[in-house]
UniProtKB/Swiss-Prot annotation:
Principal EC category: transferase
Residues annotated to bind ATP: 10-17
Recorded GO MF terms: ATP binding; dTMP kinase activity
EC number: 2.7.4.9
Known catalytic reactions: dTMP + ATP = dTDP + ADP
Gene, per the UniProt record: tmk
Keywords linked to the UniProt accession: ATP-binding, Kinase, Nucleotide biosynthesis, Nucleotide-binding, Transferase
Name the UniProt record assigns to this protein: Thymidylate kinase
Length: 212
């Protein structure tokens, strides 16, 4: 089977790290051991610097919504061109913690940036490049935020209002409903059931890939 790009998406506290472990276990059970892990924003020296700016901001300066989204796409194109595409070209599988869907949901939905601008940014920066599979971990924002707060200090985005995350979730669900490559997982279940749901969805997808 050719190398694939699998992305894990979701709000804060959705359990992306646990989901990644489940994805890796399923892939390795299928004999897929050459796996590259990525996270967004980040993954290259420049992208990591941009991540710090996006997450923490700069004292005394307001980070505008458009500046935020432009930095996210700058970080993304660095990661895609320098890490993800080369990994796929040499036959590695790539498992990503977030990708473009995050920007479409957080900045397009949460921030309310015009959908045409968001689509234009995606198409200009990424062209036709898309993940082969996205696992979207869905849960009520209040639940996810409670989990995030329990982990400790919140970053700039995690400190946004509940209404912001409600809008973000709504956009996630809207986009997932219109794209067959996005599989929605109920992340409000107990962790064992979430892992089982991910395993089932991924195993079925892998079977379908072998049949193509």
């Amino acid at each position: 089977m050719n190398s694939k790009f699998i992305v894990i998406e979701g709000l804060e506290g959705a359990g992306k790290t646990t989901a990644r472990d489940t994805v890796v276990a399923v892939l390795r059970a299928q004999g897929i051991n050459d796996i590259v892990f990525t996270r967004e924003p980040g993954g290259t020296p420049l992208a990591e610097k941009l991540r710090d700016l996006i997450k923490q901001g700069i004292d005394g300066e307001v980070l505008t919504d458009k500046a935020e989204v432009l930095m996210l796409y700058a970080a993304r194109v660095q990661l895609v061109e320098n890490v993800i595409k080369p990994a796929l070209a040499r036959g590695s599988w790539v498992v990503g913690d977030r990708h473009d869907l995050s920007s479409q949901a957080y900045q397009g939905g949460g921030r309310g940036i015009d959908s045409q601008l968001m689509a234009s940014l995606r198409d200009t920066v990424l062209g036709e490049f898309r993940p082969d599979l996205t696992l979207y971990l869905d849960l009520p924002p209040a639940v996810g935020l409670a989990r995030a707060r329990a982990r400790g200090e919140l970053d700039r985005i995690e400190q946004e209002s509940l209404a912001f995350f409600e809008r973000t979730r709504a956009r996630y669900l809207e986009l997932a409903a219109s794209d067959a490559s996005i599989k929605t997982i109920d992340a409000s279940q107990p962790i064992e059931q979430v892992s089982a749901s991910i395993s089932q969805a991924l195993a079925q997808w892998l079977t379908n890939q072998e049949l193509v």
